[in-house]
Amino acid sequence: MIILRRNKKIVELFPIGSSKGALNSRRKPLFYGYIRLKRTNNQIRPYKFIVKKGDKESLFPPSEAVKILKKQNVYLIDGDEEIEEMLDSLNIDFKKTRICRHCTLEGYITVVNRNSAFISNKEYICRLCAEEEIKRELKYKGLSLSAFNNFKRMLDETGDLDKVLSVFDPKFNPVKNPDLTLFDKITVGKDNTPPTEIDKINIPDELKKILKLHGKYLLPVQSLALQNGLLKGENLLIVSATASGKTLIGEIAGVPNAMKGKKFMFLTPLVALANQKYRDFKKKYSKLGLKVAIKVGMSRIKAKEELTLPDDDVKNADIVVGTYEGLDFLLRSGKAGDFGELGTVVIDEIHMLDDKERGPRLNGLIKRLKSLFKDIQIIGLSATVQNPQEIANEFLMKLVEYDRRPVPLERHLIFAKSEYEKTDIMTKLARAEYKNISKKGFHGQTIIFTNSRRKTHSIADYLTKRNIKAAAYHAGLSYSKKSKIEKDFANQKISTIVTTAALAAGVDFPASQVIFEALLMGNKWLSNNEFSQMLGRAGRPTYHDIGKVYLIPEVGRKYGEETEDMQAVSLLESDVDPIYVQYDEDDVLEQCLADICSGRVHTFEELQNAYKNFDLPLGIEEAYDVIHDAGLVKEKDSKLSSTNYGKAVSVSFMDLKAAEYIRKSINPKNQTKKKRKHVDPLEIAVKLDPFENAYMSNRLNRRLGKALNINLSARLFADSTLDILSSGETLSKLEPSLQDALINMQVEFMSCKCQDRPFCNCFQEELSRRILKQRMLHKDPVDISKKLLKKYQIHSYAGDIFSWLDSVIRTLEAIRRIANAFKNHKVANECSRLIKTIEN
């Protein structure tokens, strides 16, 4: 096989062996030759034939060139009238073909055709060269090769290298070129589940009327649950996408039970979610004569813009909505009898079993429920479980799995060259999405996830300045502010919410588009499961036709060993991880104590059997010895029971180290008569749980960063921040008003005598005392926040101050319980007084 190609005044010859398998095969020519043509006797003929091997050129008779051509299959590159005339006149058959020009520059020949090649600068090049061009561009732009497969996929889909590389053009617009940013698309898929009419379900007619307000038929996953014994008391694990109708499954089983006098409990991991469900259920089911109660363990702190959710009496309630801990508190208190007959318990977000802190508690709660209430129906709900059958088997549940999304989901990947470009891209995406109106008549709306509260505000402000109605939303905001944002988003007055990844589990906005501005949760990469949960928030069947997810990693941005673009590709290529309950030693002690307090186990043998299949870091015998020696449990006639101290510790959800600190602090026997001093419960609370969410004001942070020419952390208690704030040299670099604030900070918070000052806990503890002092003077969290900013340039959100005060009350309640356990009524009464003062 010989390739002929016109190159200006010469015709190049490339003999590359057999024509069989030549297509897309990179070959080294046997030699490189060229001929010169001229017209002789009105015919085109070779008049010079040169062969080049290595650096040596040899001149051959032109007739040799003709012999070679007549013996080989001849392929002509592109059309050339002169060459074609010569071949025809010599009776040499030929075909036309294409070769990759990039390969020839490297001394190779690759035959390509239109279907197997890729367009580059109006030419066709082979796959290998196209891929090498992509790799070179990735390296030049500072991107890791982990992104290569995505570009390779784009190359296959478009067949156009120029188009693929256009994404690196500064003028590239992702809104106008969604096909070039698309990573993949998760389709709805055909559903073969037979529709179920609500009228044909065996539930009370009054409930049917309520359900039919949203349609005559059940959704597919709801039908599957019915087929698997939902109304026959079967324990079920429901695994299905967000917005596929999981919550209603619990209601279909639980509400009829409630109407028969059996309690229906709906449990969530977060107070905000519990409050939302409480409002929904009260609105829906009060008309059926059912009493709805809430149990979340919140205090009664009175504060501007905040909601208090004092716990209702669950004894007389038909439906109880609560947090996991709200219910477990009653079980650990030994008050399981307060529930009367328990019918159905729904565990929402059951994948929280994988959470490092909440997982062991949730696992223990489910086990206690199953032991204490033999006939209850437990329904677990989750959108993300990789090993659902394993979880279902663990809790003796039937698995109902529905893997179809209610709306299709597009996942996009865009590489930003800078933080400014990233923000500009988000602006374009949010603006374009709001202009999209679905077939249901709703504007597209966006959730942007970032990794810090400060960034939620800076991004929202940037969008607002560009005429996009955006709002920052995070845990530091007051209840009324969050509530207003939620309502405005629901009413489509706001197009974009900017929130933190940490709040993802509590965000329930009906968004069509989710943008990941950052791939971190705080300072840690998102896990595969967290990522899956967050992207699942894009697209709701009631509102949208399609969901969209955009990841916008910044090229070159690195956290630890991985770059942001590497992590983006890794997350998009990942599956969810299996869910396993992870215990540490404190978890083992807490759960053993909770099982004894609740009455789940009564003997040591029962305690061992309860954990015989668990891989624990601490043996049950050793764990029992620890809680027994600490005086938390006792044994009489082989029967185990908790002491008053043990019950106090368990219902306070407190680890043994903190409990022992309280016990020793309030015990007069631990103090000599000379050193005996007044026990201050507030001081104990501050030591155990100091205020954390304090930041430098934006103004102070900017001025210091500019003066010192560094990127300074805004977190007040970060070591780098403490080092700078405590330095006398820092003062001279600030304007007078900021100097005054910094002097106030240094004098009032950083003047301790500790050897490791300023890296001791004194600053944090003293700030905590100041906040408490202001609250004891009846100051509102909003006012306290303003005072900290004005006097010290310390920024703390009012919502964070409110939440911390609530946490302080939790600690004071624990101190009171432990004091009562040891009959120290003086300390207990002081705790009651302090709680009342803080609440009011």
Language-model features, listed with the residues they occupy:
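Helicase-associated low-complexity/disordered flanking segments
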Residues: 1-223, 227, 233-236, 290, ...
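Walker A/P-loop NTP-binding motif
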Residues: 227-234, 245-262, 280-282, 367-368
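Conserved Walker A/P-loop ATP-binding site and its immediately adjacent core
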Residues: 247-248, 262-283, 328-329, 383-389, ...
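Conserved helicase ATPase core of P-loop NTP-dependent helicases/translocases
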Residues: 302-310, 458, 469-472, 477-500
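SF2 helicase catalytic motif II
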Residues: 320, 324-328, 334-373, 378
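Conserved interdomain linker/interface between the two RecA-like ATPase lobes of SF2 helicase motors
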Residues: 367, 375-460, 554-556
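Conserved segment of the helicase C-terminal RecA-like domain
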Residues: 376, 509, 520-569
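C-terminal helical accessory/scaffold domains
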Residues: 613-616, 621-623, 629-630, 634-840
